[in-house]
Amino acid sequence: MNSNIEKSDKPSFIKISEQPSLYDDLEKKSVREILEDINKEDQKVAIAVQKAIPQIEKLVTQIVPRMKQGGRIFYMGAGTSGRLGVLDASEIPPTFGMPPTLIIGLIAGGDTALRNPVENAEDNTTRGWEELTEHNINDKDTVIGIAASGTTPYVIGAMHAAREHGILTGCITSNPNSPMAAEADIPIEMIVGPEYVTGSSRMKSGTGQKMILNMITTSVMIQLGRVKGNKMVNMQLSNRKLVDRGTRMIIEELGLEYDKAKALLLMHGSVKKAIDAYKAG
């Protein structure tokens, strides 16, 4: 027997996200063939996300009570994964009227990395935790790592330190049994399969990550009372389109004339506040 071979009960880690594409000779295909192939692969993403719903539910149900006590969400990632975390976090203030400090996206390499690659940033195992401590992270907060491969050192280092400090950790990955998932209290494994262009995780993996991030923040915000019926009653009135939309929400709820509803909205600054003030007399 080879003494270098060790038996292990741990499930094997397979980088499915980097396996060869199911398609070849892409440069020989017509534009229509390429588009249809990509669309065919994209249809697998929603199915993979659906299978992950039980884990997404577990994470959301742990996040909500923490946020009711003043907790926050920190997304952590590199490259596409980091950018998607920043994107989702940046949509929370305008959509739900919450402060930008409630859900924070951190990307390896900082804001520069949103547009340009930052060399070796994702390989730094300590910088992620340093950034979290700069935000005074505490045990009411949640850290969610995002990495298709599940191997990003910047993310894994931060999650490991967070767990050591009793902070809830989750993750979104496209590979089973990854090192990142090992650092997550609640791992979300979204197995979308090989990418159309081998290893290009901005494709199916990125699409699935965005879907799951939407699900997490939308369900959390609904649970926190930031939606009424099916409407964004706490949205920020940052342009004429949204002022008009908010005005029509008030008309639907209160039956007022347009000008009166708009004046009420502008006076109180949000649909919810305007409706509550009107009903209070």
UniProtKB/Swiss-Prot annotation:
Listed Pfam families: GKRP_SIS_N
Identify the catalytic residues: E91, E122
Q: Tell me the pathway.
A: Amino-sugar metabolism; N-acetylmuramate degradation
The GO molecular function terms of this record are:
carbohydrate derivative binding; carbon-oxygen lyase activity; ether hydrolase activity
Q: What domain of life does the native source organism fall in?
A: Bacteria
Q: Which UniProt keywords apply?
A: Carbohydrate metabolism, Lyase
Q: What is its EC number?
A: 4.2.1.126
Recorded hits in SUPFAM superfamilies, A to Z, give: SIS domain
Annotated catalysed reactions: N-acetyl-D-muramate 6-phosphate + H2O = N-acetyl-D-glucosamine 6-phosphate + (R)-lactate
GO terms in the biological process aspect are: amino sugar catabolic process; N-acetylmuramic acid catabolic process; peptidoglycan turnover
Q: What class of enzyme is it?
A: lyase
SIS domain segment(s): 63-226
Q: What else is known?
A: A lyase-type mechanism (elimination/hydration) is suggested for the cleavage of the lactyl ether bond of MurNAc 6-phosphate, with the formation of an alpha,beta-unsaturated aldehyde intermediate with (E)-stereochemistry, followed by the syn addition of water to give product.
Subunit composition and interactions: Homodimer.
Q: What does this protein do?
A: Specifically catalyzes the cleavage of the D-lactyl ether substituent of MurNAc 6-phosphate, producing GlcNAc 6-phosphate and D-lactate.
The text of the family note is: Belongs to the GCKR-like family. MurNAc-6-P etherase subfamily.
Which NCBIfam families does the entry link to? Answer: N-acetylmuramic acid 6-phosphate etherase, PRK05441.1, PRK12570.1
The identity of this protein, by name, is N-acetylmuramic acid 6-phosphate etherase
Q: Which organism is it from?
A: Bacteroides fragilis (strain ATCC 25285 / DSM 2151 / CCUG 4856 / JCM 11019 / LMG 10263 / NCTC 9343 / Onslow / VPI 2553 / EN-2)
Q: State the encoding gene.
A: murQ
